[in-house]
Amino acid sequence: MSTTREKLLATTTKFVSAFGSFDIEEMLNIRTPTCLYHQCCPSFDKNVVTNEETRASFPQFIATFKRFDFSILEPDHTLVDEAARKVMIRAKTSAESIVGAYENEYIFILKMTDDCRLIEEIHEFYDTIRLKDLQHRLEANRISFGDAAPF
């Protein structure tokens, strides 16, 4: 039988795989139906996103990126709080957008269900300067960035 730590890390691995998959069903299947996604970057006026909002904005994500690679940076620095059922990872993306290369770094805090198999809450922190650069490049090409972009 797996330990709590092993279960938390297994779900985290599924999250990372799903995030880079370009498959909305895979992304949502590891979340509870009531999962809340906190985008913790107030300069973008994004606060809390539901699964339904993620699904609705996903076509814009697919239209913006041709390739989206997502992985954990420094896996040895992953923090696991078994009692709180939380995992914190530092991650990176390397992507090819319709307006050129895009790279960013993130901190994710994932809160899991009691059985550690699903994610019930996500907190995401990212480099807003890099995202603003992408936004400006999209706008310069008259491509709508949108308020509900899931990135």
Curated annotation (Swiss-Prot):
Species this chain originates from: Penicillium brasilianum
Protein family (similarity comment): Belongs to the trt14 isomerase family.
Name of the encoding gene: ausF
Domain of life: Eukaryota
SUPFAM superfamilies assigned to the protein according to its UniProt record, in alphabetical order: NTF2-like (SSF54427)
InterPro entries per the UniProt record, alphabetical: Fungal_Meroterpenoid_Isomerase, NTF2-like_dom_sf
One record GO biological process: terpenoid biosynthetic process
Pathway connected to this protein: Secondary metabolite biosynthesis; terpenoid biosynthesis
Note from the entry: In A.calidoustus, the austinoid gene cluster lies on a contiguous DNA region, while clusters from E.nidulans and P.brasilianum are split in their respective genomes. Genetic rearrangements provoked variability among the clusters and E.nidulans produces the least number of austionoid derivatives with the end products austinol and dehydroaustinol, while P.brasilianum can produce until acetoxydehydroaustin, and A.calidoustus produces the highest number of identified derivatives.
PANTHER family: AUSTINOID BIOSYNTHESIS CLUSTERS PROTEIN F-RELATED (PTHR39598:SF1), AUSTINOL SYNTHESIS PROTEIN F-RELATED (PTHR39598)
Protein name: Austinoid biosynthesis clusters protein F
